[in-house]
């Protein structure tokens, strides 16, 4: 590939937010919700230039009259037509580039169905005519961004959480664990517990308001039971939030009850282990000789690890599970919301990476299955 002078595009398609930009940059140029909105009503004003669908921030700002759909659920694309719209919007409206002129690096969750990455590959080459592309595993990119080659990444986004142990740059597939519990589930849970307080949030548009409440006010308690006691006996933990219509609501123990579900999935009626236990289980599936290195390099990544207090709590929980002499270090980089994208930007601009791209020629020769041979 003679793409030396052409900047590669890096697109981190999250279940909740799409992060896009140019390889070599230190932050994504465009960050917008992975949403496609369609009008709930028929237009009556002629000449308003109404569209049959809106994408990203445009959909977000008109949410009162739209039905919002997320084409990516639990890290897996469930609606390819909408996904294509999001990519089209990314190239032409956000980045303002011609996709046929740039190699494209996409990301995906580990343990995704094979068909998912094949279809991504097919759309990139056949619909957008990209000269080259690559699909990278999200957690591996986060580790790159933290400047490490060994560690265990606990990545929790909007749709999926997973723990990926990586040793000397190799991910250890047998020890990767996936947890279909992430930000969107926390938002839904917040909707539910706010209902108990007498505030009703039901529509897709109202869910976005609750997501904002969660992002602005929620935190992780170091000791959940003690925090509940504190919340019950004083109003020190209460915060108020103004809704778009001016009504002010007060939230108290919901602030830490919501993200507690990451550590106690039983709150959501799920039988799975919490993120701390999943991390521990993942480490235990690795060779006994490398566990020490993993315990001392637990890297948090993704938007659902942005809650204040999460690193301290993670440290406390892992310390309780691990052997008593083990040194445990949780790394929570401030830019971890975007660390997958940043890692992608680093990877796509490495000189050694240039021979890793899948070229249009290779695709035409082998078809979509080439992605399994060239990308891991």
Curated annotation (Swiss-Prot):
Subcellular location: Cytoplasm, Cytoskeleton
Entry keyword annotation includes Cytoplasm: yes
Keyword terms, alphabetized: ATP-binding, Cytoplasm, Cytoskeleton, Hydrolase, Nucleotide-binding
Highest rank taxon of the organism: Eukaryota
Keyword Nucleotide-binding annotated: yes
EC class: hydrolase
A single GO BP: plasma membrane repair
One CC-aspect GO term: intranuclear rod
Reaction catalysed by this enzyme: ATP + H2O = ADP + phosphate + H(+)
One example GO MF annotation: myosin binding
Signal sequence residues: none
Main location: cytoplasm
EC number: 3.6.4.-
CDD domains documented for this protein: ASKHA_NBD_actin
Similarity field: Belongs to the actin family.
Role: Actins are highly conserved proteins that are involved in various types of cell motility and are ubiquitously expressed in all eukaryotic cells. Multiple isoforms are involved in various cellular functions such as cytoskeleton structure, cell mobility, chromosome movement and muscle contraction.
Protein name, as recorded: Actin-3
Organism name: Dictyostelium discoideum (Social amoeba)
Phylogenetic classification of the source organism: Eukaryota, Amoebozoa, Evosea, Eumycetozoa, Dictyostelia
């Amino acid at each position: 590939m003679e793409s030396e002078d052409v900047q590669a595009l890096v697109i981190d398609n999250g279940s909740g937010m799409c992060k896009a930009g140019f390889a070599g940059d230190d932050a994504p140029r465009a960050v917008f919700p992975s949403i496609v909105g369609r009008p709930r009503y028929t237009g009556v004003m002629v000449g308003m230039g109404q569209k049959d669908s809106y994408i990203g921030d445009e959909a977000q700002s008109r949410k009162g009259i739209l039905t919002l759909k997320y084409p990516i659920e639990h890290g897996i694309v469930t609606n390819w037509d909408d996904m294509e719209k999001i990519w089209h919007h990314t190239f032409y409206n956000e980045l303002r580039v011609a996709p046929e002129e740039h190699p494209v690096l996409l990301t995906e969750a580990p343990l995704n169905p094979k068909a998912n990455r094949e279809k991504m590959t097919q759309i990139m080459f056949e619909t957008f005519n990209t000269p080259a592309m690559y699909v990278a595993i999200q957690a591996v990119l986060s580790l790159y961004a933290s400047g490490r080659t060994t560690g265990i990444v606990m990545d929790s986004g909007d749709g999926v959480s997973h723990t990926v142990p990586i040793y000397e740059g190799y991910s250890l597939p047998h020890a990767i664990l996936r947890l279909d519990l992430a930000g969107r589930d926390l938002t839904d849970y917040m909707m539910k517990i706010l209902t108990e307080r007498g505030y009703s949030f039901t529509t897709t548009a109202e869910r976005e308001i609750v997501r904002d409440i969660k992002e602005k006010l929620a935190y992780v308690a170091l000791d959940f039971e003690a925090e509940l006691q504190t919340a019950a006996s004083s109003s020190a933990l209460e915060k108020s939030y103004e809704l778009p219509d001016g009504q002010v609501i007060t939230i108290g123990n919901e602030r830490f009850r919501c993200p507690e579900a990451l550590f106690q999935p039983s709150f959501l009626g799920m039988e799975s282990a919490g993120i701390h236990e999943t991390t521990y289980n993942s480490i235990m599936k690795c060779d006994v000789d490398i566990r020490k290195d993993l315990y001392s390099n637990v890297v948090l990544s993704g938007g659902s690890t942005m809650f204040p207090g999460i690193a301290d709590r993670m440290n406390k929980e892992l310390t309780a599970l691990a052997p008593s002499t083990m040194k445990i270090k949780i790394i929570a980089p401030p830019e971890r919301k975007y660390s997958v994208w940043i890692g992608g930007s680093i990877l796509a601009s490495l000189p050694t990476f240039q021979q890793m791209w899948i070229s249009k020629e290779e695709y035409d020769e082998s078809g979509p299955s080439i992605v399994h041979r060239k990308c891991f």
